[in-house]
From Swiss-Prot:
Boundaries of every PPM-type phosphatase domain copy: 23-329
GO molecular function (one): metal ion binding
Protein name listed in UniProt: Probable protein phosphatase 2C 60
EC code: 3.1.3.16
Species this chain originates from: Arabidopsis thaliana
Record family assignment: Belongs to the PP2C family.
Amino acid sequence: MGIYLSTPKTDKFSEDGENHKLRYGLSSMQGWRASMEDAHAAILDLDDNTSFLGVYDGHGGKVVSKFCAKYLHQQVLSDEAYAAGDVGTSLQKAFFRMDEMMQGQRGWRELAVLGDKINKFSGMIEGLIWSPRSGDSANKPDAWAFEEGPHSDFAGPNSGSTACVAVVRDKQLFVANAGDSRCVISRKNQAYNLSRDHKPDLEAEKERILKAGGFIHAGRVNGSLNLSRAIGDMEFKQNKFLPSEKQIVTASPDVNTVELCDDDDFLVLACDGIWDCMTSQQLVDFIHEQLNSETKLSVVCEKVLDRCLAPNTSGGEGCDNMTMILVRFKNPTPSETELKPEASQAEGNHDEPSSSN
């Protein structure tokens, strides 16, 4: 089977939810692709005053995106920095922690279950056979215990995933991104990119790649990966003399903090299956049009997916998996925050937003 189907799979997974702070709708669709490698997480109540939303676009398989959707928000919540009120640091650490957790026997077993290579029952049996070392989990705040087994030396997956997540806490929005999924906010009908697409040809990315011993060919890292940052992709993270953030490909996210205000119309998180077809401003304009007649946010997302789906696979655009989360805030408060509009720039030329790590 090639990378494309003969006819697209247009059935969608859609969902809506709300609490006292916000409401969201989401939708995902496999489309023309031979397999579905996107995943997402929408956690309305990460704690009493915090919501978490994330999109994960896998490549080389679905296991890393599914792993992130299952565990990344848990790592944010369990980190000591989060408990101390430092959301940005907890996000940064959670991205790197994904790579660590996917290694060894435990990581191999979790990925095998998520990849349907062993069923959950088999995984449980294997977990009993290859049991955690006594005492090891006591030193890990997330109780991710080391396991003995035939895959104890597993270096982690060579497949990978983007991660673009938003944490809403009180009046603050934290956005963390690694890869080319994107987060955009509409403020007074203007699109503002809250994340930067990490591509190998960006100067800072190129410098890191070359210093780490990699190369760029045809816009791809070592001629194969069209992203410069991702979770997983461990084959690009094997230089033992470099820290994680300086490897050829790194999971290090840009973290951006924004004060929400009453001018904010909505927030969008979406994988590049959307952004390859529409600019940030085009998507914001399209959503505003739909919101004039449609109140259910998941339906708006579905209309975006249908709008982006290509009639055939000849062009490439509109043929990817598609996932989108749309968020509207309740009772926002005035703010002096200034954002730099980025949708007005040439498509694909996005300045890095101010960030705090």
